[in-house]
């Protein structure tokens, strides 16, 4: 028997005996309240009885007569009235029943057994004449709740037997033609509206024989909740309204199969093709196609991105003029005679024999041997330049110039005086050495350099080996035509040297034109000067200063953002030391008798257990620094909290690292002594903020001695012990590099140096037929033995274009060497590359300088990575530089205002 608002109907024949289940009746107070309502509804039920339609043929009662109700019937009528009112309250506040048919309700109450339905179905809307108080039974598609069962027991009376569960009406009865199946919630709402209409009207119109067509009740559509969510929502009042919500997806299917005929405004349905979930977001655009240089666009896209980012960040963090009091003075530069300069000069006066083979150009096998401090003319097609420094190269850096200045480019370097000299790191040592400054001319992107690389001047030092040198990133260069009152000279840059005696020396370099104009006509060529440094930076303090406690200074890093006042150094004992260069504190700054300064650090901490091999600042924020030591650890530091590193990674023995401007991580070169098999080479390591895994940039068989990155190109270059110089274009490291496909397409060789033996004298050797497949040369442990029986062969790659790169001979040779490289470590590695540096200047951003054990320094232009976009940026920078240039005039002293300089002050 179903409970539906105003009454109950027993359909068909009933079993004589039903099962009885005792259910607790409602409280006395609640029944007394319902008695009052029952008296109020007696008049309404009388009107309903008068408006009942006549029965259809075949549905009459067998007696065909109406008997007056007895006292027992009246008692049942009162109970039915009470149950009618209770059903109104319970149905409007009933919770959603469980979705399982024939099981327990949401509250866990068991379904009572009811009487069987009649074999002949009834038409909805018609009344049974045998029961004058019967009401139309609305259809039901869900289970009854516990409240329905309670009302059912109350209406039947505790003394009456229960009827079995009625059979389910057929589908055609539950789903009228032209309508979708209605759920129980819609039926309850419809029944409630019918009761309101009965109270307002005295009679109801006779329903049609085909069945009633109930008006649609519009309700906001919500997604169907799960069974667990619906059970939890019974205690929440808002969750009980789920019975009035239709399932969106099920409604869409039913509406497509049987659309409503009597509804003029159908409910809006979401299109099925609309994606949902995370996949509905905007997809990342793909870079398809090929760039003009022959590389895919997805490889070149990070290069173009880095160009704009570097330009914007340099405008924010770089300066036009800093350290105005440190101007070169002519009388501090003492020109040495030939006899005085001899101890500082490298011992080798001639370079080893070498030859150059360029891809795509037939060579005649020319063998070169050049003098010390000499160079060969740039190749007219490939623009590569070579010169000889006289000894193994261990320190190298470009002189920064402002963007758009179109000025001459300079590199400073240090070569060891002896080819066979070794330097123990555990002990301090000093001795003569020569700091060299080379001029490369105006390196343009459109034309071959017109001038040879030339030795400008040298600085004689007595601090031993120079392990590292760094120029001030910006604000130290001024125009060479700036006129100054004697003895002041226009400044080229500020240079810091990390020496093997534990000191850091700071020099103010003048422009070569102004300095060479001060020397007499019969002066020695090349010019070697003995210079008094601006400042000497030491560890310790004023009262306790012992450089031997920290050992040799192995690495330097200049603060990359303006005002560039801090300089960091890494020492052999694991200390990282910081100096404040313009400090006036008497505890950190002492003026010596010769006019120079001695500076002491303002901060230092123990960063590693062993020697600090390299350090780098974050170029976007000077609060962060990274260091790598001989303890195989890479540590990221926040200088505001130096007591603990931000991130510490122990992987391998790092030789050098590079922190590119756009990315939150460093590219690391490694020694192969601790590397896992197949994993030696170049790695990109995230700083820890993004949590990405290490990205294997390029595999190498031997130790990678040097690594350099170009902020303008988003590219790193590395030179190793086997004499191969390669470049790798990094992907966009702002996203996870684990998804990068085909990393082999992102790297390419620049040149490969091989040590080739010859049988007889160099004049009888056929160099044109010699190749890198020559058998391994005999073991030679000294430089003299090596050059007597070997020569160097440089095999250059055509860098003007990268079309068909994967099938070209240099690329195949590089890939073969990555898997089957032959290293001979028991001889002098004359072909090894020790230092590599990309140009940091916009005017020469595609140029790369490298050198190594042989003392030969080579310059290459990676023309294929340049683009018309970069050329437009260069033109804009030149226009801005010319707008800021002012006519120069003599200045009165070192403390002049920047407004009197050739550049306008910083914005």
From Swiss-Prot:
Biased composition (Basic residues): 98-114
A GO molecular-function annotation: RNA polymerase III general transcription initiation factor activity
Biased composition regions of type Low complexity, renumbered to the chain: 148-158, 211-221
Keyword Ribosomal protein: no
Chain segments carrying region Disordered: 25-186, 203-289, 758-780
Positions where Phosphothreonine occurs in the chain: 891
UniProt subcellular location: Nucleus
Record function comment: Required for RNA polymerase III-mediated transcription. Component of TFIIIC that initiates transcription complex assembly on tRNA and is required for transcription of 5S rRNA and other stable nuclear and cytoplasmic RNAs. May play a direct role in stabilizing interactions of TFIIIC2 with TFIIIC1.
Name by which UniProt lists this protein: General transcription factor 3C polypeptide 2
Species whose genome carries this gene: Mus musculus (Mouse)
């Amino acid at each position: 028997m179903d409970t539906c608002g105003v009454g109950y109907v027993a359909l068909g024949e009933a079993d004589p005996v039903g099962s009885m289940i005792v259910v607790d009746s409602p409280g006395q107070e609640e029944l007394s309240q319902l008695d009052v309502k029952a008296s109020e509804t007696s008049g309404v039920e009388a009107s309903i009885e008068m408006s009942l339609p006549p029965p259809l043929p075949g549905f009459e009662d067998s007696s065909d007569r109406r008997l007056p109700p007895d006292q027992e019937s009246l008692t049942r009528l009162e109970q039915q009235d009470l149950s009618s009112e209770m059903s109104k309250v319970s149905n409007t506040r009933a919770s959603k029943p469980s979705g399982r048919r024939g099981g327990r309700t949401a509250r866990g109450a068991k379904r009572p057994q009811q009487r069987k339905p009649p074999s002949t179905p009834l038409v909805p809307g018609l009344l049974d004449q045998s029961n004058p108080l019967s009401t139309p039974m609305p259809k039901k598609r869900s289970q009854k709740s516990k409240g329905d069962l309670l009302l059912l027991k109350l209406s039947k009376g505790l003394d009456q037997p229960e009827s079995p569960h009625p059979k389910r009406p057929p589908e055609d009865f539950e789903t009228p033609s032209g309508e979708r199946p209605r759920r129980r919630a819609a039926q309850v709402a419809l029944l409630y509206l019918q009761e309101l209409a009965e109270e307002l009207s005295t009679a109801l119109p006779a329903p049609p024989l085909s069945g009633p067509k109930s008006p649609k009740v519009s309700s906001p559509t919500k997604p169907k909740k799960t069974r667990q969510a619906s059970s939890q929502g019974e205690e929440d009042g808002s969750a009980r309204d789920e019975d009035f919500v239709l399932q969106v997806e099920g409604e869409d299917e039913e509406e497509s199969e049987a659309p409503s005929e009597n509804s003029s405004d159908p409910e809006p349905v979401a299109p099925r093709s609309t994606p949902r979930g995370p996949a509905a977001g905007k997809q990342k655009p793909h870079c398809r196609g090929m760039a003009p240089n022959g590389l895919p666009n997805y490889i070149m896209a990070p290069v173009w991105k880095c160009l704009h980012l570097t330009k914007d960040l340099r405008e924010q963090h770089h300066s036009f003029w800093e350290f105005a009091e440190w101007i070169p003075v002519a009388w501090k530069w003492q020109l040495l005679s030939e006899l005085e300069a001899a101890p500082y000069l490298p011992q080798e006066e001639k370079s080893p024999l070498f030859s150059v083979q360029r891809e795509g150009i037939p060579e005649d096998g020319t063998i070169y041997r050049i003098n010390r401090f000499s160079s060969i003319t740039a190749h007219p097609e490939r623009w590569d330049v070579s010169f000889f420094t006289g000894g193994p190269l261990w320190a190298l850096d470009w002189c920064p110039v402002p963007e758009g200045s179109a000025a001459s480019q300079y590199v400073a370097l240090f070569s060891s005086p002896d080819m066979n000299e070794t330097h123990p790191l555990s002990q301090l040592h000093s001795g003569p050495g020569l700091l060299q400054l080379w001029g490369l001319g105006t390196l343009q992107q459109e034309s071959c350099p017109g001038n040879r690389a030339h030795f400008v001047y040298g600085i004689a030092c007595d601090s031993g080996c120079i392990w590292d040198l760094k120029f001030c990133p910006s604000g130290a260069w001024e125009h060479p035509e700036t006129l100054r009152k004697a003895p002041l000279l226009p400044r080229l840059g500020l240079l810091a040297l990390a020496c093997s005696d534990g000191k850091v020396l700071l020099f103010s370099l003048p422009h070569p034109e102004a300095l060479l104009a001060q020397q007499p006509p019969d002066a020695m060529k090349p010019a070697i000067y003995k210079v008094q440094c601006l400042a000497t930076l030491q560890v310790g303090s004023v009262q306790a200063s012992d450089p031997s406690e920290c050992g040799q200074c192995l690495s330097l890093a200049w603060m990359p953002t303006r005002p560039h006042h801090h300089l960091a150094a890494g020492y052999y004992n694991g200390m990282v030391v910081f100096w404040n260069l313009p400090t006036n504190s008497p505890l950190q700054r002492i003026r010596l008798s010769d006019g120079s300064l001695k500076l002491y650090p303002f901060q230092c901490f123990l960063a590693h257990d062993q020697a600090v091999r390299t350090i780098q600042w974050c170029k976007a924020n000077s609060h962060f620094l990274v260091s790598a030591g001989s303890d195989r650890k890479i540590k990221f530091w926040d200088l505001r909290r130096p007591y603990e590193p931000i991130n510490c990674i122990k992987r391998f023995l790092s030789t050098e690292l590079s922190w590119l401007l756009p990315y939150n991580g460093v590219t690391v070169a490694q020694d192969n002594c601790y590397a896992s098999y197949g994993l030696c080479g170049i790695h990109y390591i995230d700083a820890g903020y993004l949590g990405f895994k290490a990205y294997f940039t390029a595999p190498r068989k031997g130790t990678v001695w040097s690594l350099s990155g170009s902020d303008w190109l988003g590219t790193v270059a590395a030179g190793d012990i086997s004499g191969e110089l390669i470049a790798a274009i990094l992907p966009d490291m702002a996203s996870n590099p684990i998804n990068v496909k085909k990393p082999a397409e992102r790297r390419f060789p620049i040149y490969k140096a091989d040590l080739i033996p010859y049988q007889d004298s160099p004049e009888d050797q056929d160099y044109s037929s010699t190749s890198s497949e020559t058998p391994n040369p005999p073991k030679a442990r000294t430089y003299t033995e090596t050059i007597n029986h070997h020569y160097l062969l440089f095999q250059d790659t055509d860098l003007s274009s990268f079309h068909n790169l994967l099938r070209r001979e240099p690329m195949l040779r590089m890939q073969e060497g990555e898997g089957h490289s032959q290293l001979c470590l028991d001889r002098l590695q004359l072909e090894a590359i020790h230092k590599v540096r990309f140009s940091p200047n916009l005017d020469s951003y595609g140029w790369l300088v490298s050198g190594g054990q042989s003392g030969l320094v080579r310059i290459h232009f990676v023309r294929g990575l340049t683009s018309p976009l970069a050329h437009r940026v260069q033109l804009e920078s030149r226009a801005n530089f010319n707008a800021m240039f002012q006519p120069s005039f003599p200045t009165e002293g070192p403390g002049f205002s920047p407004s009197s300089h050739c550049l306008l002050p910083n914005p």
